[in-house]
Structures are given as C-alpha cells and as structure tokens.
Amino acid sequence: MFLPTTREEMKKLGWRELDVILVTGDAYVDHPSFGVALIGHYLVSHGFKVGIIAQPDWRTEKDITRLGRPRLFFGVTAGNVDSMVANYTASKKKRKTDDYTPGGSGGKRPDRATIVYTNLIKRFFPEVPVVLGGLEASLRRFAHYDWWSEKVRKSILVDSKADLLVYGMGEKAVLEIAQILSRTGDIEKCKSVRGVVWWASQKPEEGIELPSYDEISENPEKYAEALKLQTWYTDPYKNILIYQKQDTRYVVQNPPQLPLSQEELDRLYLLPFEREVHPFYAKMGRVKAIETVKFSITAVRGCFGSCSFCALTQHQTTHVSYRSKDSILEEVRILTKKKDFKGTITDVGGPTANLYGSSCSIRETKGQCQKFCLYPSVCKIVRPNHDEFISLLESIRKIPGVRNVFVSSGIRHDFVLAEKDPDVFIRELVKYTPGQLKLAPEHAHPKVLSLMRKPPVELFLEFKKRFETLAKKMGKRKYVIGYFIVGHPGEGWRENNYLRDFILKHLGYFPQQIQIFTPTPGTVSTAMYYSGLDPFTGEKVHVERSLKVRNKMKENVLFKKKGREKR
C-alpha cells in the first residue's frame, strides 16, 4: 500500500483528513530502507491516517499545502542523509546529482532542509505542531560544529523553531506523540516521551549538563567534553536526562527509547510496503537509491562498533537488535513474488551484517560500559553468533525462486577473527559473496586507526589472506577489496604516505574506494576536527583543514602522481 501524496489518493482511501503529514527531502520510496515509509506505515498500522509530501518546492506554498492541514502534526526530515552531505562533496563543491531524487538531478532539496521545511510549514500552518526526525535532526540535536559554515550552530530544534525533535530510530516515539496528541491535543504533554528532545525555560532539576552553546563556541576543548558526555550517557538502559544551555533556554534530551524487541522489529519489516517509488514521483524519473536496496533484507539494526567517524553511535546508540529467521524468510517470500525479481537477494544484513545474533549481557541490561565492544580488541563478554547467521543464509537460499543470496553490507573482520576457528564462517562467507567482498580497514597507520577506533590493519591482511586462500581452494574467483579514508584527524603526510605504501605493497591494485573525511555533525571524529583533541583521552590530534591538501592526499593514495608526497 502506497501512502497518499495527493488529495485524489486520499479520496480513493476514503480519507477526508490526515492525522499526520510527513515531509521529506527524498523522493517517496515505499521501502523499509527509507525512514518516512517506515514511520508512515508504522503509524497507519496503529490506526492513524498518514500522508507524505516528498521534496516540496520550498519557494512556494503549492506542495506543502496540497494535503491540507493535518489533525495532529507535521513530521519533518531532511531524508536518509544530512542535506548538506547530500548537496555538497567532501571538497565543498555543489553536487550536480542526487541519488534520492527522481531523474538524479541535484538542487531538489534545499540546504539545511529540516530548517527550511519547518519554516515553510510554520508560515502556512502556524498552529500545527512540527516534529523533527531523521539523521539530520538527530545528529544536530545539541549545539554542533557545522563544517560547511565553519562555526558552531545551535540545536536544530532551536534554529528551526520546531516543537519537538525525535532522535534515533523514531517509531515508538512518533507513535507515542501521535497517541498523546490524539487524546489531549497538547504538545506539552509529549515532552515526557523517551527519545524526544525539547526546550525548557528553566534548568532541569536533574540530569547531566553539557557545556553550554556559548562555552563550546568560544572553547573547542569544551566541545570535545560535551561530545564525550553525550556519547557515554545517551543510553536507553542508563535512563539519564541530558541538557544544554543555549542563550536563555535549555535544550533537553530525554533518555532514548528502548530498542525494538525482536517481535516489534519483525512486525515492522513485514508491514505492506510496495518496495517501489511512488507513481507520483516515478513519472518524474528513475530514483537510483532504490536500486541497491530493492531486493535487500534488513536483518540487523544498530552497531556496537563505535567507529569515531560513524553517525550510528550518536543516532542509534550501540545497541543491536535483530529479526527472527521466520520473519526474514517471510519477507524473502514476498520479494520472490515481485514481477521484476530475478532470483537474487542482493544483501542480507544491516550496518554490520555479522552482528546478527550477537549479544552482551552487560550492555543489554545496564547499558554501554566504560569501554568499547570492539576496540582496541573484541571484548570477551561480547558473544558472536556466526552459526546463526550462516543458518539464516542457508534457509534463504532454499526458498523457491531464490537463486543467489549475497552479503553486501558491512562485515567486521575483527569480529570474525575473534572466533576459535574463523575459517568456519569465512568458508561459508565465500559462498555468499558477489565476486568481491568489501571491507573497511579505513587506514593503515596505527595512530590514525586508533583515533578512528578501528582494528589494526594486520587483522585486515589476515582476514584477506584467509578469505582468498579458501576461495581459491573452493574454485571461486573471489577477492577482498578495501575502503579507505584520507584527511581524517591524525593524518598528516607521513601517515598518508604510510597508507600509500601499504596499498602498493599489500593490495597490488590502485584503489578507487578512497573517501576524503567529511566532518559531519555529531560524530567523535568531527569533535576531533574542531577541537584538535581526542575527546576520550584529551590528547592533542593533528588536523588537516586545507581542502587543497586533503584533495592532494586523496590523489597521493590514488597514485595519480609519481613518487611520494613530501611531509
């Protein structure tokens, strides 16, 4: 079932009025990989009428008013990625293309889309509450360093003048908000909901206070301190309120929602998604973003890898939940009935596929402890369950109509090597790899890897050797390729040349999978970039801020110039 995008579609459903209207910076793709589709179907499954306005023209009222006034609230998201990341390259150049837009052309979403859409709604529907959500809002919920303007900005809740902000995976919080507003009509009563950020005129009586907006604007060290506190205390099982003064008000973060149970996750992903671009937007052109996920399966939600540059820790916390085998097999059966299904499940996974079935008795009862699960090495308390993941893949392959099953999402090779006999899983993984297994060592220099909170590169080499040796014995031409980041805090020319030499010596090919580090809001790496400090050790960190030098670092590793760069 497609959710309505026009009045005509509402009439066909017999809906005279909508309870909730969701506004997004992406095209409307009715697939569980897209946030508005998940939230929209979840609300509908609980009896609410929901419509979607995708990529509205922000220069006119035509699009934002086409579904009328919602009974309860507008929900606003910039889309699956931060709008500034969507609109600009790592060299701050305007992108000409957008994979989330029909036809692939850029310019269909505004910069700082969450703020722009909220202001547009407030202009034409000033009395209707606006609730923010999605990655952009979640990662900008407190005062944050904004690389594009090169300054610290206030909470996006304050800047946008929205009523509430939902952070993390928002199904439960948005449902509670809808239920409270349906009963009372009072947005103030929604400020007790877990997973919500709100503002207060008075300082909260309890909780953890972060350094204020003024403090972190004037002192980058305070920014590092704020990020550390936010990281440690944002945990559903610690149940701690966090707040930050901004001007004369306080931005208040309630404790996160508890992760969805397996039963809740199962029900969510089996809602009646069309797994297609909505016809209203499909007629405008192809949406490239659906092509890689259309016949994929989300088996895992969350990641406890805690990589410094990754937004997941701040967005979803470190808690991992996973679906039951029965639920996943039922979704595969649904996919096999699609007219354009060719027999291949392109991916079974999530942020990190081989965390499926893993558990930690401490994290799942008391919250994240004062150490990282996989750094500097795999914690002994974390229990992998690769057998269960392999059993799942084997069961999928036996379903009529399925010819191939692939694992294309992240694999933590250090987690595999922590097993007593890693080859048991690696041998099976060879069967489910589509030619090349993509791993993310990210760098080679020990200092940079330590700041990234990534395992030693020697583990990548060990895994690569095991995988390719087993593949050869099995008569399979399958290989491991690496993804790398340059320009990350801690990298100068010495470290960059070290990475170049490593690739030349150990990989034997010129890699194309090289990214320039982008300081996106809310991550540990961005705190390092702005403050010049490791937030968790207080040690000084070298930061390369010159766009010209950062681009040269990429060229150096891509072997576009002969010889090594001088340091």
Swiss-Prot record:
Its cofactor is [4Fe-4S] cluster. InterPro entries: Elp3/MiaA/NifB-like_rSAM (IPR006638), rSAM (IPR007197), rSAM_horseshoe (IPR023404), UPF0313 (IPR022946), UPF0313_C (IPR024560), UPF0313_N (IPR013704). Keywords: 4Fe-4S, Iron, Iron-sulfur, Metal-binding, S-adenosyl-L-methionine. It holds the Pfam family DUF3362. It comes from the Bacteria. Binds 1 [4Fe-4S] cluster. The cluster is coordinated with 3 cysteines and an exchangeable S-adenosyl-L-methionine. Residues 288-560 form the Radical SAM core domain. This is UPF0313 protein CTN_0332.
